[in-house]
Amino acid sequence: MAVKGRENLIAKQWKHGLHKYIAGIIKGKEQKSIIVNGMPDHIHVFIGLKPSMAISDLVRDIKNNSSNFINEKKFVKGRFSWQEGYGAFSYGHSQIESVYDYILKQEEHHKKRMFREEYLDLL
């Protein structure tokens, strides 16, 4: 999920709180949060999704609730919102560890590549 306008609004001081909050949203929807991590302008959310849950519904709830959380806490000046849309990918059980490591090492990864390059490679 990307911040609206790709602005660098997710600050180090509160990003871990945001990640925990998003993991709580996922757990509250009875899904499995594997890892949440990201950069100042976007986040990656790795979820074990049950077949009964539509990814679009879960992403909508994550975006709505996390935007409200950020705005209520006044983490940013003005109004925070996520960009429209999202990218969703499915992975096999054998890929869980490599996807987890990829998301865990976002800061290191982005020292080498920009988000656009990263996203195009995932497609």
Predicted regions, residues:
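Basic nucleic-acid-binding interfaces
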Residues: M1-L123
